[in-house]
């Protein structure tokens, strides 16, 4: 039996490049509160973005259920993610720093900075604010952002289909895409009520991309 902890330096994510480190029980040491917290935050964040868990190969074992889920792109889903960040920042502020090595201190600082920046972005009543990713945009859906692009890429490029359980997970995600589109539509409508509409040239690119993806 192995003890699994997410790589501390890679916890920043989206925690976009998170990885699992394993150590034999004979050499296992009790992780510091900081390491335990970063590991917990990484898994909680991956629960908000199950597709990332699949891309990283982490939707296995106790986390296998993530393989059949998609992130919540509705206004309620965005608010839940914002609350997670707010709570996480409190937890990060409380974790003891005394005696930590420079690598761990750096991991905490980078994670805290990324979470704070994302939290500030999510406080805005429109757009997409990511955690540790470049895909920030004032629009809920645009030519390079949205379920219309992300779900097909996930299912075609990263979703394993090796057995019946995998096939069921694939179908579950395919069905859940409709819910994602509804959530994004609600955010687009809310942004429009605020007068936030993409310029025509971006709409043209987005519509062309959507059209090409279904032809």
Language-model segments: residues:
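N-terminal export signals
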Residues: 2-4, 10-28
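Short, flexible active-site loop motifs that bind/organize anionic cofactors or intermediates
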Residues: 1-2, 95
């Amino acid at each position: 039996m192995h003890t699994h902890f997410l790589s501390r330096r890679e916890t920043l994510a989206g925690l976009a490049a998170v990885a699992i480190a394993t150590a034999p029980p004979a050499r296992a040491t009790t992780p510091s509160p900081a390491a335990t917290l970063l590991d917990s935050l990484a898994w909680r964040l991956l629960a908000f973005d199950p597709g990332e868990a699949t891309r990283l190969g982490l939707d296995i074992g106790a986390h296998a259920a993530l393989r059949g889920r998609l992130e919540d792109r509705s206004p309620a889903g965005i608010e839940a993610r914002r609350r997670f960040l707010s709570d996480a920042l409190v937890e990060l502020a409380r974790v003891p720093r005394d005696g930590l090595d420079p690598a761990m201190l750096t991991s905490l600082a980078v994670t805290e900075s990324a979470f704070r920046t994302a939290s500030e972005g999510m406080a805005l009543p429109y757009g997409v604010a990511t955690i540790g990713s470049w895909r920030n945009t004032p629009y809920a859906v645009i030519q390079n952002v949205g379920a219309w692009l992300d779900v097909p890429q996930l299912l075609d490029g990263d979703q394993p289909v090796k057995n019946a359980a995998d096939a069921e997970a694939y179908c579950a995600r395919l069905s859940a895409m409709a819910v994602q589109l509804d959530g994004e539509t609600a955010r687009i409508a809310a942004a429009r009520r605020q007068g936030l509409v993409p310029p025509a040239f971006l709409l043209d690119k987005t519509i062309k991309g959507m059209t090409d993806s279904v032809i």
